[in-house]
Amino acid sequence: MDVIGNITDLSPTVSGIPDECGLEPHDFLEVKFFLISVVGTLIGLFGLFGNATTALILTRPSMRNPNNLFLTALAVFDSCLLITAFFIYAMEYIIEYTAAFDLYVAWLTYLRFAFALSHISQTGSVYITVAVTIERYLAVCHPKSSKNMCGPGGAAWTILGVTTFAVVFNCTKFFELQVTVNPSCPDGSNWQSYILLPSAMASNPIYQQVYSLWVTNFVMVFFPFLTLLLFNAIIAYTIRQSLEKYDFHNQKSVVAALSASVNLPRNIAGISSRNELKEKSREATLVLVIIVFIFLGCNFWGFVLTLLERIMGQETLMVEHHIFYTFSREAINFLAIINSSINFVIYLLFGKDFRKELVVVYGCGIRGISLRLPVQDKFVIWRHWKRTKSRISMNTTNRTRHKISLPQTLVEHANLERLEETRFLAHHEDGVQTQVSPIHALRNGSTPKIDTLQDLTSNGRPCKTSIIDDNGTVVCTVTEFP
């Protein structure tokens, strides 16, 4: 977002006659007013609410971790960006649309500071996104290094470093704008009495060529864009490979727990705890990938327009492609507002723990309206791409194959105490047979020996055996193949 290139043209026409002290609004003012001042403001208000809620939830004791600390800082920078965007761009079109001169004078008074704060917020938002991407990259691809480098202290120092860099890098922005008095309209009561112009420093050719052109475009456009694209491509590929292996490793852990002869519930509880930690890490990574790809999508057109400005020249675009260039710049501002407002929606849709904490913070209902928030993980389809339920396959002999199907509650709750006495029900098209078998038959890695089942499977058809507890609840299912 560039204020200098968006300065109001203060040379209006009245009844077709130029008025050197009057106001001439922007071209397509009605469209810009509706897009930025109306729709953009509504989206920004929602974004401020969402970012405040995000910061409130992610700082709760149960949600505190290095990744959420980065996301909290991102919410703060995005909120500052939304506030400055309103007071710079939305307010400018409101002033022109309503012809409020007093508001225009106030706008000129604070514009220089809002302009610098806008760039500081934008730089902080970009590099917090880069920092959390690198943190997730280390957690996914180099977990051992991540434990040593990405603790809470490291995250806090990184955020402090990003904030310091954002302030230092943009400190000259405080001096790029100046308001001068127009000698042709010196009374101070006309629109042209005060003129907003680039300062002498901003007009310096060396400053423009080195800082404004090459350094700013590299630091704010090319480097973060390419870095995010590269790291998130690696993360996305690693996640895809991890999800394909997720079922196998999870099933292997359950088999190991079932094979233990002592402390079976404790073993499965330990496996469940480890799986839960891995699940939370995987969810955090997937949420970040979505945030970054939306960030890249919202900033892609700004990346393209910057390339066009460097190749064709800004003056050429303004003169020969005036409509295209004008609306492209407004689209960039509008997409920046969307990008700073949408993270809350991503957390709400894809963050299971975030939804739980949201219900705790705001309660189950607001003025009688029940909040029906989804409770299932939105990425379940990724993990169950090739299956419909958790299954464990193992071979016991060369002639007979067994498949044990376990419900998810077996791993999550580790409630196996009631399995010491179970009933094996053999289901078959020819009839049903029942036989009692203890749980230790599963602990040694073998399936229960039931003579009647061998007769039933001799005709070449599989036989399904269900393990049920005293309450009649099916705990697991053994499918025997001939």
UniProtKB/Swiss-Prot annotation:
Residues 1-32, 90-113, 170-218, 306-330 are extracellular. It comes from the Eukaryota. The chain crosses the membrane at residues 33-53, 69-89, 114-134, 149-169, 219-239, 285-305, 331-351. Expressed in the ASI and ASK chemosensory neurons, in the IL-2 interneurons, and in the male specific CEM (cephalic sensilla, male) neurons. One of its GO terms (molecular function) is ascr#2 binding. CDD domains: 7tmA_FMRFamide_R-like. InterPro entries: GPCR-Ligand_Int, GPCR_Rhodpsn, GPCR_Rhodpsn_7TM. One of its GO terms (cellular component) is Golgi apparatus. It holds the Pfam family 7tm_1. Glycans are attached at N6, N170. It is a multi-pass membrane protein. Residues 54-68, 135-148, 240-284, 352-482 are cytoplasmic. Gene3D superfamilies: Rhodopsin 7-helix transmembrane proteins (1.20.1070.10). SUPFAM superfamilies: Family A G protein-coupled receptor-like (SSF81321). Keywords: Cell membrane, Cell projection, G-protein coupled receptor, Glycoprotein, Golgi apparatus, Membrane, Receptor, Transducer, Transmembrane, Transmembrane helix. One of its GO terms (biological process) is regulation of dauer entry. Its main location: membrane. Belongs to the G-protein coupled receptor 1 family. Homodimer. Heterodimer; with daf-38. This is G-protein coupled receptor daf-37. It comes from Caenorhabditis elegans.
